């Protein structure tokens, strides 16, 4: 089971992109931390998913280390079978969702490396020339 959470519509935005690339999986849940939600509501929303799927390995992917979604998720992970990632990007979620879809546990080190490798700057830069008006 994968839970994606973050500030604003970070989670639902990533899920939308993920669905286009790998398909819509039932084992991926999203919890957005929007401006009309307080930290306790966020915690309750995430906890309800954890409680419902407590028999499964659970992985929570968050946006920022130290942010409210990360802190709430980390707190909930202490008493549950949950692993928490921060700094989530789309390549991490693609790999994680493929692992779960194949019935594998998520290789946390591989997911971390995938996230890091996805942000490497490219050596070749494409230059655009402005056409005259």
Where are these regions (language model features)?
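N-terminal loops that bind phosphate or other acidic moieties
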Residues: 1-61, 65-133
């Amino acid at each position: 089971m994968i839970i994606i959470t973050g500030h604003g519509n970070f989670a639902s935005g990533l899920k939308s992109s993920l669905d286009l690339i790998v398909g819509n999986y039932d084992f991926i849940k999203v919890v957005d931390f929007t401006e009309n939600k307080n930290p306790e509501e966020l915690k309750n929303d995430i906890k309800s998913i954890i409680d419902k799927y407590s028999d499964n390995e659970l992985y929570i992917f968050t946006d920022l280390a130290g942010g409210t979604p990360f802190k709430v998720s980390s707190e909930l992970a202490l008493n549950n079978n949950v692993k928490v990632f921060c700094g989530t990007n789309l390549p991490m979620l693609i790999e994680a969702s493929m692992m779960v879809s194949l019935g594998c546990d998520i290789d946390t080190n591989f997911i971390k490396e995938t996230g890091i490798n996805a942000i490497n700057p490219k050596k070749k830069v494409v230059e655009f020339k402005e056409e005259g008006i």
